[in-house]
Amino acid sequence: MLYCLILLLCLSSTYLPSLSLNQDATILRQAKLGLSDPAQSLSSWSDNNDVTPCKWLGVSCDATSNVVSVDLSSFMLVGPFPSILCHLPSLHSLSLYNNSINGSLSADDFDTCHNLISLDLSENLLVGSIPKSLPFNLPNLKFLEISGNNLSDTIPSSFGEFRKLESLNLAGNFLSGTIPASLGNVTTLKELKLAYNLFSPSQIPSQLGNLTELQVLWLAGCNLVGPIPPSLSRLTSLVNLDLTFNQLTGSIPSWITQLKTVEQIELFNNSFSGELPESMGNMTTLKRFDASMNKLTGKIPDNLNLLNLESLNLFENMLEGPLPESITRSKTLSELKLFNNRLTGVLPSQLGANSPLQYVDLSYNRFSGEIPANVCGEGKLEYLILIDNSFSGEISNNLGKCKSLTRVRLSNNKLSGQIPHGFWGLPRLSLLELSDNSFTGSIPKTIIGAKNLSNLRISKNRFSGSIPNEIGSLNGIIEISGAENDFSGEIPESLVKLKQLSRLDLSKNQLSGEIPRELRGWKNLNELNLANNHLSGEIPKEVGILPVLNYLDLSSNQFSGEIPLELQNLKLNVLNLSYNHLSGKIPPLYANKIYAHDFIGNPGLCVDLDGLCRKITRSKNIGYVWILLTIFLLAGLVFVVGIVMFIAKCRKLRALKSSTLAASKWRSFHKLHFSEHEIADCLDEKNVIGFGSSGKVYKVELRGGEVVAVKKLNKSVKGGDDEYSSDSLNRDVFAAEVETLGTIRHKSIVRLWCCCSSGDCKLLVYEYMPNGSLADVLHGDRKGGVVLGWPERLRIALDAAEGLSYLHHDCVPPIVHRDVKSSNILLDSDYGAKVADFGIAKVGQMSGSKTPEAMSGIAGSCGYIAPEYVYTLRVNEKSDIYSFGVVLLELVTGKQPTDSELGDKDMAKWVCTALDKCGLEPVIDPKLDLKFKEEISKVIHIGLLCTSPLPLNRPSMRKVVIMLQEVSGAVPCSSPNTSKRSKTGGKLSPYYTEDLNSV
């Protein structure tokens, strides 16, 4: 009997690993069954019982073949949290990072996860509350990552019960309430990341000072107010401190300089005041310091040479004094951004000589003297931005050898001398801006080396000589601005090869010869300004077929011959052909007194009202005398009748005029075919075509047959409790529209013809868009049953994206729309799209400007507002990009972002959930042809990128345009990295991916 027992024991010990192996494999297979695996990432998880799971992808085992780790990061898995994995008895680490794990988490999911040490569920689609029982279900947990989901409700106060937790990351969710003070009890914490949630305004809990082992504290965008609590001075192990995008006040505490291990301090975009701590030199481990966009005063401390700084950002403060010479001795400094301050003096001569500088932006200060010759001393400088200072002297030959440069902006200084030849041909240079200086010399042929050049801005200098043919080899060039120089010779024929060219301004030079004839390649040319030169010959008729040209100024030249009739094909905002030697008939479209100044100074021109121009023959002159006598007699009769009618009309309109036009100030931005009285006559209720928060919109049909849209802003409401119904809001809306639309020109931006401002009446007159808004077409019950096909929708998306890209990247300063939505995208007669309604637009404010900023109760519209707005109450271009992403998803689904079918989800969440559960086809608007499914899928991907919860993960509008062009086939695909999201590396704050002053 004893022998049998011993034999049985031996046999069972022999088979125990096998039993455990089979048990682990069974659990893993069951987990696989509960998940959708479109990428076949789990294909190695075999059904064969003889195959060890230790060799399966994502599975790791210990020495006894027990599964201890499951890492399914970025496997593109879809489904609920696979809680069955917790049944793996030896499981210590579980990662489902960057998948589409959805649904909510419950306490039951973690009942059997007692052995877990690390749990990573970040970058998924989880919703609902965080289970309060997690500290009790996971007593051994050291690492908890749930960032980048859609979790809501508060952080459970029970999280203070974790006894071994070292890292807690809940960033990028929709958590509310406040940061629980109980977290101060988790004294084992080394990393606490709660950034970018929807917390209520509150102070930093003083109890966090108990976390003396804390190395990373990331509380960016947490709606924090008040000063930094003194208790945080006990966090002597801190390496990274990030408090950006809050409303913290007071001075930067001096104890912060006593942190002996700190490498990064980010205080960007708060309301800190006072001076920088004098003892900053004590922080010998500090690598990155950013206190930009605060209210700091005083001087930059002089002991920065004691630091190992890699990045120093102090822009948009009120700092004064010189840049300390000691900063030149920093051997690690790569980023120096001090723009928009009051800094003065001469830059240290050795700046850059001992530092690997990459990004230097000292714009909008009061610096003087020469640009340091060794600023690119180590050959790594990429950005050199020194706009609007008082720098003088010449550009060093050393800069002409700096092949790493990509953006150079030196405009509005007092620089002079010749530009080094090598400087013109730097191979990586994309933007060269030298405007408003006193440079001399010519553009050398070496410019052919600047293969990446896209913007050449050299206006208002003393450049001379001819424009080299080699510029025509720079295929990516978008802008050539060389006005107000002394260029001579002919316009090179090679320029017509520049297919991406959008702006060509060579006005006020000494150019001669003819305009090149083969202009058909200028498909993107928006502005052509050759005024004030010595150009001659005929105006090429090819100018009239340039599809997006809206600014044409050829005035003050020596052009001759007739005006091409083809110019009537253009939709011009600006036309000026004055002071030339043109002759013949003015094209009928322009035979109007409002264009008189555009043709003045051309004695040979005539207006052919009756099919007759002047003939210099005696017999014809006699005939004209009789005709003129008859005309005068008839005119006299008409005049008398007209006077009577005019008096009657005046009496009728007197009341209207007295109230709306008595003190009116009309301001036009284009050549007008109508008068203000025509507009006032048509502001009748029967002509109302729309209502908005700021007023009514009228359709006005003018006597000449033209149609315009007129927005009449609401009158101020006296009394009441709504602060946003006041007259100040009307003024802000009016100012924002005028400031924005009155100064920009783009084919995808609606035109503002003119405006009127009087005591009680404000009118904005726009071009009329006959097909209404995108919202009307997608969601309205329109007569005629207009259904937008996919090609039309894709074109609308691209048009709108180009308009927003122009606002963000090509306007100086950049413009944030702040209310991007389908009802603010208007459609012309060909269903081309134009961005409209800039009533709450925000113009980026430059140093010293008095730019008004229009405000409203909410910057945006329901369903389109970016999530970060709720906790920062601030907007930037990333807010527009989020809203545009919603529009893209709206175009694909045909649903409104407030549609009841979406339930409590926003558009992006609904699309993600529907894709996970049902696949692509149910998401697509049933009105669309599924033969375009591949293109539609790509646009959905772009829309989801744009609506990423973290601003960091949203592409720029310029990138969005490129991606949409790739979808439409307008440009070849560039094979971008299509991974869903990437973990933030380096700096914690997600607002550093694009240069803030790199327009």
From Swiss-Prot:
Q: What is its main location?
A: membrane
Q: State one molecular function term (GO).
A: protein kinase activity
Membrane topology label = Single-pass type I membrane protein
Function, as annotated, reads: Receptor with a dual specificity kinase activity acting on both serine/threonine- and tyrosine-containing substrates that controls floral organ abscission. May interact with the 'INFLORESCENCE DEFICIENT IN ABSCISSION' (IDA) ligands family.
Q: What is this protein called?
A: Receptor-like protein kinase 5
Segments crossing the lipid bilayer: 622-641
Q: Which residues are glycosylated?
A: N98, N102, N150, N185, N210, N269, N282, N452, N576
**UniProt remark on cofactor binding:** Have significantly greater activity in the presence of Mn(2+) than Mg(2+).
Tell me which species this is from.
Arabidopsis thaliana (Mouse-ear cress)
Q: Which gene encodes it?
A: RLK5
Listed SMART domains: LRR_TYP, S_TKc
> Which reaction(s) are listed as its catalytic activity?
L-seryl-[protein] + ATP = O-phospho-L-seryl-[protein] + ADP + H(+); L-threonyl-[protein] + ATP = O-phospho-L-threonyl-[protein] + ADP + H(+); L-tyrosyl-[protein] + ATP = O-phospho-L-tyrosyl-[protein] + ADP + H(+)
